[in-house]
Every structure is written in structure tokens, then in C-alpha cells.
Amino acid sequence: MKTAFNRRTVILAAALGAGTTLLQACGGGDDEPQRNIVELAKNTPELSILVEAVVAADLAATLSTGTLTVFAPTNAAFAALLTELGVSKEALLANKPLLTAVLTYHVLGSTVARADVPLGKAITPVSGGFFKIESNNGLKITDGRNRVSTITATDIQASNGVVHLVDRVLLPADKDIVATASALPDFSILVEAVVAAGLASTLQGTGPFTVFAPTNAAFAALLTELGVSKADLLANTALLTKVLTYHVVPARVLKAEVPVNTAITTVQGQSFTVNSSLVITDQNMRTSSIVATDVFTSNGVIHAVDKVILPK
């Protein structure tokens, strides 16, 4: 009699296309010992590069024990990564620090089945950092560099955990809040303000922080509201510091984790609220809309807002 595991592998093979055989030679007896994650990968042709990488990074023993969840990139995912990074497979496998950082970013220190995935919330792998998974025409992972990967197969059982297949290698964040904002043209005035207020080093620190980041249009509207020039605003470091720190929360808060209609305390000390439509009400009862969410950084997350919020 075929095992339930064998039935699953047939389904997964069909999902990945005709001619691709996942988890070959799984055996047919109900009493056959279940393979661990590394053994499972070794018997899966589509994971052969992953196995090479695990061996090169000296992670085989680690992934053979414990209780783990592995988001396993397929060979096609690794091929795409090599093109993206502009390196050969040999060069990647020889870079043990990078390889270790990337591979451990795909591993959770507990078993998380498909049904238990905390959708939209921060997921912390054993490497540190975070990513999120959302249900959007399938399960999508957004990694630390805001790249998106699709989970193509789920709940492949191993003796020491579970494996989910992904079609793109996940990469941990490599830019802090200031560097991330600096790379986005719509935050250029915000970056000028952060530098002028002497807050750059703080927002480059460990964190984590959540920044409700005003766009350039938001700053332009503020200048009109206050009747000052940009130069005047940037020169008023006391006001700048008070206003900017009111946009920073000393914790990582993703969109799905924002407490609705509950006071959110900022680094500045005062609070604001966010309603279910992602509209912020500040201390002066002025409102601002969150227009983009969950821009990930190495030390937190950025949400863009269309109006500068003001403390009392």
C-alpha cells in the first residue's frame, strides 16, 4: 500500500510540470522510516543545487536534526539568483558567509504548516531578520529586500519538520531605513530633514523602528500649511526633531499588525491612532492616509503617508 507521503509527492510532481519527479525513491512501505529534511532534498531532483549549497555551507548536520521549517528554493530559483547577482554557481558556493546567511534565512526554528502560516505578519527565520507571507493568488513571500517569491508546494513532511518549495531565493535585507529611503525618490525631502535634524545615525541603528514616512508632496503641503520655506524648516532643528520623531515607532509594526483605533506611542512621546482604512489621526485631529505599506529594511519597516503628522 502506498503511503500518504507518496500520494503527496505525485500531486506535487504534477504541480511542477510533466516530467519533473519530486522526492523520487521515497519507498512504498508504511513502515519505512521517514527521511529528514536533507535526505528528502537529496532525493528531490529539483532541489539538487540547494543540497550542494547546504553541503558547501556546512549546514547538512544542522538541517538533519531539530524541528524545522525550510522554504526550499528550486534549481530554477537558484539559476535566477545567479543571473540576478551576476555570479557563477561555483562563486556562490565558494562564498560561505553569503551562502550561510542566505540559507539560514530560509529556515524557521519550528514546524509551520501551510495552515499555520501567520499571514501578513513578520516571520523571523533562524538567521534573524524577517519576511512576510501573504495570500494573493497563491502564497507569496516578501523578503527583506522587498522581492517577492511564490510558494509552489507546501507541507512536504520530513522526520524533523516540513518543507515548502519556493520559486525564488529569498534574500535578507541589506539596507537600513535611511539607505532605503535614500534610494526612493519620493522620500528625498524626508532624508534631507532626517540629516538636518541629526537623526540619521539613530535611524541607521539596530532598531527595530517603524517609520511613517511623509512623501515629498506631504512635505510640500506642510510648508504651505506652516507658511515657511523648505530652508526655514530644515534650519529649525528643534521643530524638525519633534516632528520627525513623532513619525517613528520604536518597534517593527507591519500593516497587518497595526493596532486599529488604539493609541500608538511614538519615539517623540506622543501618540496617534490609525483606523481600519489606514487613516492616521494626529494630536491636532489632522488626518493623513497611509498610501504605501510594508517597505522592509534591515532595521524595521517604512509606511508612506500623504501628510506630515504633527504633535501638539
Briefly describe each language-model feature range.
Residues 2-6, 12, 16-19, 23-312:
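Mature, structured domains of secreted/extracytosolic soluble proteins
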